[in-house]
């Protein structure tokens, strides 16, 4: 009887140890949120005055081929998708126009100067004319505020 109790206790202890060893990671597909870049202060022995270095800000876009969300350094002209290897052209806000699809009325974005745009939803082609153009995205949103100007406004 005593042997059975000892064996049961050993099995329970082994089971507890196995549970403690198992680490549950994040669920599949989970990615951490992108945080704004920190401002780094560098102090050198030669220069006792600290120097503030601004780390480049990140931006996001959707891959034109596989529709994955891509993060890149602001100011980049091209971004290569790590999933499908497509090189995407990065357009600034003042280089992008918007128009509603003639067929399904989906809001489409296109590079300024394009004569027409194909809808990614219904595949119809919408001609870009003066009567169906919207103002550039940058004009709709107003001037772009940098992260540093937002920090100054908070203080």
Swiss-Prot record:
The modification N-acetylmethionine is found at residue 1. The keyword S-adenosyl-L-methionine does not apply. Pfam families: zf-LSD1. Keywords: Acetylation, Nucleus. The keyword Disulfide bond does not apply. Residues 138-149 have a biased composition (Polar residues). NCBIfam families: LSD1. This is Protein LOL2. It comes from Arabidopsis thaliana.
